[in-house]
Amino acid sequence: MSMQDPISDMLTRVRNGQSANKVAVKMPSSKLKVAIAALLKAEGYIADFAVEGDIKPELEITLKYFQAKPVIEQIQRVSRPGLRVYKKNDALPSVMGGLGIAVVSTSKGLMSDRAARKAGLGGEIICYVA
């Protein structure tokens, strides 16, 4: 069976791993998944990530907890293969009143909604993280 939406699979693995109190989750790697993991680490939502293997690389994400509760309360896919969602810089959403982030794919790469607004860029809304 082929995977239709690898980004949704990644977000689901992170969500399921945190609800099961796992230390880390593994998944097949891609450039986009690594970029999303790097953004989540920079924003403080995950502890670390690493890419292992040469022929079939695997992405391992080390999950982060605070006082035995997951740091990521909500992670939700927005733009999907059947319905792409694009927004201009002035219409980028604010997640949980600015407490969360929207991961935006812009012409300058992946960035948070705050960074995209500051740079004056719009793009595809990949997911919401809070």
Swiss-Prot record:
Part of the 30S ribosomal subunit. Contacts proteins S5 and S12. The keyword rRNA-binding applies. This is Small ribosomal subunit protein uS8. Keywords: Ribonucleoprotein, Ribosomal protein, RNA-binding, rRNA-binding. Transmembrane segments: none annotated. GO terms for biological process: translation. The gene is rpsH. One of the primary rRNA binding proteins, it binds directly to 16S rRNA central domain where it helps coordinate assembly of the platform of the 30S subunit. It comes from the Bacteria. One of its GO terms (cellular component) is ribosome. One of its GO terms (molecular function) is rRNA binding. The keyword Oxidoreductase does not apply. Pfam families: Ribosomal_S8 (PF00410). It comes from Aliivibrio fischeri (strain MJ11). Belongs to the universal ribosomal protein uS8 family. HAMAP family: Ribosomal_uS8_B. InterPro entries: Ribosomal_uS8, Ribosomal_uS8_CS, Ribosomal_uS8_sf.
